[in-house]
Amino acid sequence: DDCYTPPAVYDAVKKWVIDRFTLQDFKILRPFKPGGDYLTETYTADTVVIDNPPFSIYRQIIRNYLRLNVKFFLFAPALTLFVPDTMCQYVIINSVIKYENGAKVRTSFATNLISPESGINIIISKDLSDKIKKVQKQPQKVAKTQLPRGWFNSAQLLKFAGIGNYELEG
């Protein structure tokens, strides 16, 4: 459940969703935070949830959002995407997302943003697949921690383990 979405991937998905479903005037909510409770969020007619929920309670979240009439577009595990006995719709992509914790998960999306009058229940999107693949190929900037002079982290000290024996004081 600790699969946090890389910002570049989230931004690509959010832009695609806003453009595809004409959501420019909607407030985007991200209620799934560590230690948070998504049910305590304030959902209004002009809000839409675009987020990556905990996959362990994914089906429960879908059922709650449908019951509460919350607009949503949720990241979901592709292998267990479908939620039976719901009016949920799906966007299927051919992409594996590498999440912040290093997990690589074949991902698709569950939504209720597709107009029921359209009769469409599933969208298969090469466009969204390509956008996600493109941003994942871009080198990600890694924040470098500047340590004070004379301080070391364990990764720096590992280099010495292969070349000799050392004992450090302090």
At which residue positions do the language-model features occur?
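Class I S-adenosyl-L-methionine-dependent methyltransferase catalytic core
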Residues: 1-48, 54-170
